[in-house]
Amino acid sequence: MSDVQKSRDTRNIPISKVGVKDISYPIVIMDKNKSIQHTVARINMYVDLPHHFKGTHMSRFIEILNVYREKIALDNMEAMLQRMKEKLGAGSAHVEIEFPYFIEKKAPASGAKSLMEYTCEFSASLSSEFDFILGIKVPVTSLCPCSKELSHYGAHNQRSIMTVRVRYREFVWIEDLIEIVEGCGSSPVYSLLKREDEKFVTEKAYENPKFVEDMVREATQKLLAMEKITWFSVEAENFESIHNHSAYAAIERDKREKGVDNPVDKPGNCG
């Protein structure tokens, strides 16, 4: 049977990434408290394509995914990418995995337990060297310092999303990153709150106002202090409750470069 994908292409144009995208697939993730956690991921898998090949073999991506479905973790991510390169005759391979991750949280006053969902991601690539990035998206509450200062009856507050991505030299637990990020907002977010919890969360946020600039700077300070992390990016987006726009801030640091531990600037003013 003829193999059309292997036929020669005469346009002399290589392709950086080609593959399969948005695969819904069950995976098993390492859990700090329960050893493992079963979840369902959205997965993208790509390789490069040399200029002389007409196409890649899409079915081979799924075959490789089937082999690693119970073993998608940092320990074997490089081996999975190497298998992609070999099976598809590629010079580079890439995989992006996004999945919901659940942590049991206690409400701050009542102690009521509930599961909290966080969006997490793995991004890995292999060409001449292996690269891996762990990412998390954490909802928090933010309360505007400027609104609090100017108002007699309260301050506007809103739900925010903080996104942190890290490269590291030693293993980092998802739970540990989430704990760091949740401490950078005015208050954490909970899936279950009783009346006494709502009072606690509301008052805590009011006593702990944060600009979006404050949030990314506080996260940066904490991540700079973690020796096992070599690179990171931090983003914060406030879904403003009294504006028709979001507030946004971002910081990226490569700790292997000189000067990344310099003191950061003071928070910006309300504008």
From Swiss-Prot:
Its EC number is 3.5.4.16. It catalyses: GTP + H2O = 7,8-dihydroneopterin 3'-triphosphate + formate + H(+). Keywords: Hydrolase. It is an enzyme of class 3 (hydrolase). PANTHER family: GTP CYCLOHYDROLASE MPTA (PTHR36445:SF1). HAMAP family: GTP_cyclohydrol_B (MF_01527_B). This is GTP cyclohydrolase FolE2. The lineage of its organism: Bacteria, Pseudomonadati, Thermodesulfobacteriota, Desulfuromonadia, Geobacterales. The gene is folE2.
